[in-house]
Regions:
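Beta-propeller and closely related beta-pinwheel folds
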Residues: 40-52, 85-95, 125-284
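Short low-complexity stretches enriched in small and charged residues
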Residues: 21-29, 109, 159-168, 200, ...
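Short beta-strand element of the conserved SAM-dependent methyltransferase core
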Residues: 68, 110, 119-120, 203, ...
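Short beta-strand/turn micro-motifs composed of small residues
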Residues: 70, 112, 152, 205, ...
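Hydrophobic or amphipathic alpha-helical targeting/insertion segments
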Residues: 98-133
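Short beta-strand segments and strand-loop junctions that repeat across beta-rich extracellular domains
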Residues: 73-79, 117-122, 155-176, 211-212, ...
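Beta-sheet repeat architectures centered on beta-propellers
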Residues: 1-81, 92-106, 229-244, 250-476
Length: 476
């Protein structure tokens, strides 16, 4: 009998099951050593008057302001009551749209591809209104250096056009000798499908990526194509953290640092994503960054109408996935909560989030989103996780007799699938919980074995691997 330790390495569904990687990494977060639990979503706000399709956190002085967009309205969270107040332009908005947000100074700017850019000045506005009579109608908005930049204009009539405001003046969109406001039409690459800002701007098109760099008068901005083959298929997949931007291309997931475009999903998750995602609903994707966990999260609808999260840890280049009932993922920040305000969530015994959590501290980053008509935060209990290995063995027939899950602050239930030939479909048996000595008795014979672990214990923190006892068996 031999003891063998199987580490929970990378999840690579695009590779054959005989690879020394995982076949399932569900409802977990990838780390350098194993996987951490993925938290469930809990309601943060009261109900808005319609379902939400984006969430954005703006900050003015020391005050965090949370905004959200619905099909026909814009909302602002009341930090004291958690009510979602309608702060739309008078009369609301007639079209069913998805919102894109940016902050320039103390002004929140929202784009919906139907109305002129909308603005809300933190500290003084009570409602959104047109940014300016000359402001464009845009699908995307970002801030590049000291300019507000709009892209894919006029409800798609100028889908390859970029326009920017005057320097340090988001209200001035007049092109002329006394203004640095201007525009650029990108002639090749297709329609603009996304944009990010910062020191430089990145313009994503169907079949290209263009870098937007400030060079001063008389041209103001220089536009350089950094990719003529790889573009972005869905703007809602574009998400930025620091100098890095992550996005979905026609053949998979990429990162871009402003100069280089790098494939991050090749031979890992690209084929899995396109096989599982509902292609007709990619426009309903959302994406965000969790800088604390160092992950990018893409939300999409799969072929069975299930909301699914695809998770990428950029520090260790590992992936996982989750199922969720959340419609939109977003980065947000807490508005802060007094002990009296906690009454809005029920009594101390019914709180699903620890009082030590950043949720209750104003201005702290929150991995958030929206579920129906409420803002939610991913600060709840651990999701029900499952981690399944690839095939182990293959040289001779063997019997797995014992398993010991390696789970920090917890244990696990174990199931096994054994088969003689690779053309047989692996079928997991029933899960058996580990006993008080963290042992699961098994007796499963085959040439190839897969072990599946469901981590248990409400406070389990890291699933590292599984130890098994294996006995060789002669073929008959």
């Amino acid at each position: 009998m031999a003891n063998q330790r199987i580490a929970f390495t990378e999840w690579t569904p695009d590779l054959a099951g005989v690879a020394e990687n995982l076949s399932v990494a569900k409802n977990v977060v990838p780390t350098a050593l194993g996987y951490n639990p993925f938290p469930t979503a809990v309601n943060y706000s009261a109900a808005a008057s319609e379902n939400l399709n984006n969430v954005f956190a703006g900050k003015f002085s020391a005050t965090t302001n949370i905004f959200a967009g619905g099909a026909t309205k814009l909302f602002k969270l009341d930090g004291a009551t958690l009510a979602m107040n309608n702060v739309s332009k008078t009369g609301n908005y007639s079209a069913i749209v998805k919102w894109n947000f940016a902050q320039f100074g103390n002004t929140i700017i929202a784009a919906n591809n139907v109305n002129k850019l909308q603005s809300y000045t933190l500290g003084s506005s009570t409602l959104f209104d047109d940014l300016n009579v000359d402001a464009p109608v845009a699908k995307y908005v970002a801030v590049v250096r000291d300019f507000v930049v709009a892209a894919n204009l006029d409800s798609g009539s100028n889908a390859n056009k970029v326009q920017w405001s005057n320097i340090n003046d988001e209200t001035n969109w007049t092109v002329g000798a006394t203004s640095q406001s201007d525009y650029q039409i990108i002639s090749d690459g297709g329609n603009i499908t996304g944009m990010t800002g910062g020191e430089i701007g990145l313009i994503f098109l169907d079949r290209a990526i263009v870098r937007m760099s400030y060079i001063g008068s008389p041209l103001f901005f220089q536009f350089d194509t950094i990719s003529r083959n790889v573009g972005c298929v869905e703007g809602n997949s574009v998400v930025q953290y620091g100098s890095m931007t992550y996005f979905l291309g026609a053949d998979g997931f990429y990162s871009c640092d402003g100069t280089n475009v790098t494939a991050i999903g090749t031979q890992k998750v690209d084929a899995w994503f396109y096989a599982n995602a509902n292609q007709s609903k990619l426009n309903l994707m959302s994406s965000t960054i969790d800088p604390i966990r160092k992950i990018v999260v893409w939300e999409f609808i799969d072929n069975f109408a299930q909301n699914t999260l695809l998770i990428y840890n950029w520090q260790v280049n590992k992936w996982s996935y989750c199922t969720t009932d959340v419609d939109v993922v977003a980065s947000s920040a807490s508005a802060g909560m007094t002990l009296e305000g906690l009454d809005l969530y029920g009594n101390m015994d019914t709180l699903t989030t620890s009082l030590d959590d950043a949720l209750w501290t104003g201005g702290k980053f929150l991995f958030a989103g929206a579920r129906d008509d409420r803002v939610v935060t991913f600060t709840g209990a651990n999701s029900d996780a499952q981690i399944t290995t690839g095939d182990i063995g293959g040289e001779t027939t063997s019997v797995v007799t014992l398993a010991r899950p390696i789970v920090d602050n917890g244990s696990g239930s174990v199931a096994i699938a054994s088969r003689m030939l690779l053309n047989a479909v692996p079928q997991l048996g029933s899960y058996t919980a580990a006993d008080s000595e963290n042992r699961v008795s098994l007796r499963s014979s085959g040439n190839y074995h897969r072990l599946s672990v469901i981590p248990t214990g409400s406070n389990w923190s890291n699933a590292i691997g599984i130890d098994i006892d294996v006995t060789p068996q002669g073929a008959r």
